[in-house]
Amino acid sequence: MLMTMTEFGRTVHQNGSLGTDHGRGSCLFVLGNNVAGGKVHGDVPELLVKDALEDRRDLPVTTDFRSVFADVAGKHLNIDRSHDIAMFPGWEGERFKVMT
């Protein structure tokens, strides 16, 4: 089992230095046995649609990373859903189903 993610996303549009700035939306990769693989999970915004970007530059956050982590912990490490609040204090979301 391997999960990888960045701590921040990148803006879609370039800044004045022809680079990009820290953004909100990002991606997370989950690889291994029992992963519902071969597809992109979640919502992928259409970048050419008017108002698809936040502040005309950021991908919107569509999935809370904790929901993916909780699903992987639950299925891969056999951690019961009742322990999600201990893993992520204050979080009350639902597990995002990436595991089979």
Where are the predicted features?
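Feature marks hydrolase-like catalytic cores characterized by long aromatic- and Gly/Pro-rich stretches
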Residues: 1-100
